[in-house]
């Protein structure tokens, strides 16, 4: 299992704009059904942090995949390109990057999972 994170650093106050782009709340973000129907997709979470001692906020996009191949197939898909404002297989994105300072993508292999234990009463 693979977890991919995209940590997006944004100017203070700009996080809601970025969150809407990923949740599809403004009509042009990740349509839930597009990623949910991708073979090998296991889940998606969006995290938001407001560090008090920093002049920025962070939005962390996390996706869980059966394999690295499944995740790479999503990135190559037309649905991914459309959701990210791309028309070609390129890193160039739409110009609407309001408030985004930068981002960092990381891939992790899951080596252990601890699930909660159910205690019978």
From Swiss-Prot:
It is an enzyme of class 1 (oxidoreductase). It is found in: Cytoplasm. Keywords: Cytoplasm, Heme, Iron, Metal-binding, Monooxygenase, Oxidoreductase. GO terms for biological process: heme catabolic process; iron import into cell. Its EC number is 1.14.14.18. Residues 78-98 have a biased composition (Basic and acidic residues). GO terms for cellular component: cytoplasm. It catalyses: heme b + 3 reduced [NADPH--hemoprotein reductase] + 3 O2 = biliverdin IXalpha + CO + Fe(2+) + 3 oxidized [NADPH--hemoprotein reductase] + 3 H2O + H(+). Its main location: cytoplasm. Residues 76-98 are annotated as: Disordered. Fe cation binds at residue 6. The record marks 74 as: Transition state stabilizer. InterPro entries: ABM_dom, Dimeric_a/b-barrel, Heme-degrading_MO, IsdG. Coiled coil: none annotated. It comes from the Bacteria. Heme binds at residue 84. Residues 2-101 form the ABM domain. It holds the Pfam family ABM. One of its GO terms (molecular function) is heme binding. Homodimer. Belongs to the antibiotic biosynthesis monooxygenase family. Heme-degrading monooxygenase IsdG subfamily. PANTHER family: HEME OXYGENASE (STAPHYLOBILIN-PRODUCING) 1 (PTHR34474:SF4), SIGNAL TRANSDUCTION PROTEIN TRAP (PTHR34474). Allows bacterial pathogens to use the host heme as an iron source. Catalyzes the oxidative degradation of the heme macrocyclic porphyrin ring to the biliverdin in the presence of a suitable electron donor such as ascorbate or NADPH--cytochrome P450 reductase, with subsequent release of free iron. This is Heme-degrading monooxygenase. It comes from Listeria welshimeri serovar 6b (strain ATCC 35897 / DSM 20650 / CCUG 15529 / CIP 8149 / NCTC 11857 / SLCC 5334 / V8). The gene is isdG.
């Amino acid at each position: 299992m693979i977890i991919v994170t995209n940590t997006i650093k944004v100017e203070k106050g700009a996080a809601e704009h970025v969150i809407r782009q990923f949740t599809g709340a403004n009509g042009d973000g990740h349509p839930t059904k597009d990623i949910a129907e991708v073979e090998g997709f296991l889940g998606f979470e969006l995290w938001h942090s407001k560090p008090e001692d920093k002049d920025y906020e962070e939005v962390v996009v996390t996706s869980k995949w059966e394999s690295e191949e499944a995740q790479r197939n999503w990135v190559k898909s037309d649905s991914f390109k459309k959701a990210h404002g791309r028309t070609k297989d390129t890193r160039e994105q739409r110009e609407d990057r309001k408030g985004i300072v930068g981002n960092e993508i990381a891939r992790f292999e899951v080596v252990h999972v601890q699930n909660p234990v159910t205690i019978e009463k």
